[in-house]
Amino acid sequence: MSRATQANPSVQAVPGLSFTAAKAQGHATRDEALAIFDALEPVALDFMIGAWKGEGFETGHPLDGVLERCHWHGKRFESEEHVHPLVFRKVSGKLTSVKPLLTMPGLGLLDQMPFLNSAFVGKVFQWILPLLSGRKSAARLRTTIYRGVATATMKYDNLPINDVFRKVDDHTVLGIMDLKGMKQPFFFVLRRDDR
């Protein structure tokens, strides 16, 4: 029995579909993405320390592409206690950490107002980034059990969100954003940013 079916018997492993194949075809179904996630190795906390560049992992979720259109750069894990969960690129090209509480209202509106998921809104967001920026960390790292496996998880300080990670390779993790009340998980990829 695969790790995917052990973690959740209702998710069937998809023969031949790997993380690499899903990225190459540009999308996966929710069940395919969950099977891929479940088949990956857990992540130790110290593995996550450092800067990471983010990218999408398309599954048909309303948030697919939103972060990229808003010039999301990734995440920065300074220590287990100090994490910057939302790092964006300003118009100047410099990176800035955003206060998660200030961005949350827009997430709930995406289903009702899909026009918010547009390049224009992303450009406007980039111009107002200085108003949303903060220097303090807004999350921490903990090991949690998710889908039956203990793995590194980024827990937001003031929001009901956990980002759970599984290891693709020494430089890449697949993440799931687990937001209380969200009907389906949101997937994303982080790659080490050694600049």
Q: What is the predicted role of each segment?
A:
Residues A4-R195:
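Soluble ligand-binding/transfer domains with enclosed cavities or grooves
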